Amino acid sequence: MAGHSHWAQIKHKKAKVDAQRGKLFSKLIREIIVATRLGGPNPEFNPRLRTAIEQAKKANMPWENIERAIKKGAGELEGEQFEEVIYEGYAPGGVAVMVLATTDNRNRTTSEVRHVFTKHGGNLGASGCVSYLFERKGYIEVPAKEVSEEELLEKAIEVGAEDVQPGEEVHIIYTVPEELYEVKENLEKLGVPIEKAQITWKPISTVQINDEETAQKVIKLLNALEELDDVQQVIANFEIPEEILQKVG
């Protein structure tokens, strides 16, 4: 397991311990607002919004909260004006990090992200400093306990997915960005349960971390970024051998 998929497995183990419902709701509401603003308020014609609503329902968000977020995104209700921002930087060990945020105050978010990088031994860089190490992809998570690797590979090929990366916690499917929602919905028609679907950045290659101290620092930095209210995704191009991961886990 490497890169994005590696971090996904670590995050899922952490999520079992940490259920921060209020923080999750805040992130989901922002995604609904932005999806509505970019693609309109009708989920039938806006697959990103449709997916955001599904995620909110899975998290047991009350319908009135979902409806209010859609109305804010459509300009029918007053509220914060959110924009999507991408930050780039380095974690310890030369690990490249991409941070995708949704914010109503770019200066505040930039300050918070920079503080986390600095505090944990990394550094926030200029736009373009690491993005060339990643490629934009559609990203789908499937719970590993519900679908076997063999079954998923067969169905992923059938619906035109680009790549499947099996894992202990989740299997990850990558697609061409423009085909993400089509692949997701075709998988669902074949009975595959989808835990998450989003546009993301996939590492082109990975940095191997071979010492426990650096591994611990990288994971602490990524966790701290994930916990910022404005941050929606954190992607990094690292790989940690299983024996070291068990020690720092």
From Swiss-Prot:
Where, by residue number, does the polypeptide cross the bilayer? Answer: none
Which Gene Ontology cellular component annotation is one that this UniProt entry carries?
A: cytosol
Keywords associated with the record: Cytoplasm, DNA-binding, Transcription, Transcription regulation
> Tell me, which GO biological process terms does this entry list?
regulation of DNA-templated transcription
Gene Ontology MF term list: DNA binding
| Top-level taxonomic group | Bacteria
Cytoplasm keyword on record = yes
User: What does the UniProt entry say about where the protein is found?
Assistant: Cytoplasm
Q: Does the keyword Transcription apply?
A: yes
Read off the InterPro entries from this record. Answer: Integrase-like_N (IPR017856), TACO1_YebC-like_2nd/3rd_dom (IPR048300), TACO1_YebC_N (IPR049083), Transcrip_reg_TACO1-like (IPR002876), Transcrip_reg_TACO1-like_dom3 (IPR026564), YebC-like (IPR029072)
Q: Which residues form a coiled coil?
A: none
One Pfam short name: TACO1_YebC_N
Which family is this protein grouped under? Belongs to the TACO1 family.
Q: What is this protein called?
A: Probable transcriptional regulatory protein aq_1575
Organism field: Aquifex aeolicus (strain VF5)
